[in-house]
């Protein structure tokens, strides 16, 4: 078990202390705990580098990734439909390159929600999500001689995996929200789900039939949510995430009578609790350390092109330039300016450093 902390006496990356020393008798079950130095705390550098772990975090919302060049579509930029919900493979590759070159590093949605943001110094977290379980999210071309799935290199996961190879320091991950058809490849669905959770990706709930929760009965809401959780329980028990991406972003406020069934769903004797719910748009979300952070109703940023208007991908990242979360590289501390300190949640159990 390794933790890091600032230390005025030990140089960066040197061992400050360890629980088991030379000559110690090691018993079964003993854990080696090591504390590594981050070097001397330099508040002037933190300030000059704009380190701010109270900044906002973009949760990107994707749907289909279509094997096309952007020049082949009649719509704006990399959009494949007029509303920009589906994106060309070329545009998705460009998105990933843009994130990397502009200092964004992917983190798991669950880690963001839990405040476990492990991002290198000076970089910013970004979360990727995909709705609907489209076949082109992870398209299977067949099986190899060992029975493993062969992933289409132009599907979303194929493209993501290529970035793992291109940038070894790029923590490639995403959360896929599925309906009752899972990834719409019946002969491969089970293998797809298992492959995803074994390779750094997560799978969540998008209701059985893409239900408009605002327009539905309480029984429908419970049935649709429980149905997907039960499917995931049967195939990847304890390995999926209890998170729902709300179809259509509905209901549009937490006061709606059906919202309680989103967070706790019961049908035919089965009950599931949901830790977080995702909306459809539009802007970056609060830091998980901000007192206004609410994981049960998280905003997302639509990954579409609209010439820098209406919170398209260009506009979102332009706005983030002055308010983005910038990491100090230490998951055990929260660093921000003194003027931001009043925004820190009372529930935070990490060391707070201000400059």
Write out the residue ranges for each language-model feature.
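Short loop/turn segments at strand-loop or loop-helix junctions that form parts
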Residues: 60-65, 129-133, 179, 206-208
